[in-house]
Amino acid sequence: PAGPSKPADAPAIKWTVPAGKHAPYVYFIRNGNRMKIGTTTDLRRRIRTLALRAENIALLFEGDQRREHEFHKQFAEHRIGNTEWFACEGTLADFVRDQTVRVFREEESK
């Protein structure tokens, strides 16, 4: 099957991180085998707060807390305790891979 050229556990998309305040984004940011699904209107600050780098961003979606909560429900089986962190395995890992492939295909068709 088609897929990104990098391993599933490596960030594959180089996202542009806006400076300062912006419309809300739901982000999937990786730290080892864990994925944080959160929302922010200042992505650059959030990355610094988490002591991570832009390269750790796996996916970005336009959306607010409602969309974030939809993702939390969708991947509830992978949730780590009562946090916004999820084990990046099973359906969550598949989703990240599939969305990465979708983004690459959209970029190629431009």
What do these predicted regions represent?
Residues P1-K110:
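Non-catalytic accessory segments flanking enzymatic or RNA/DNA-binding domains
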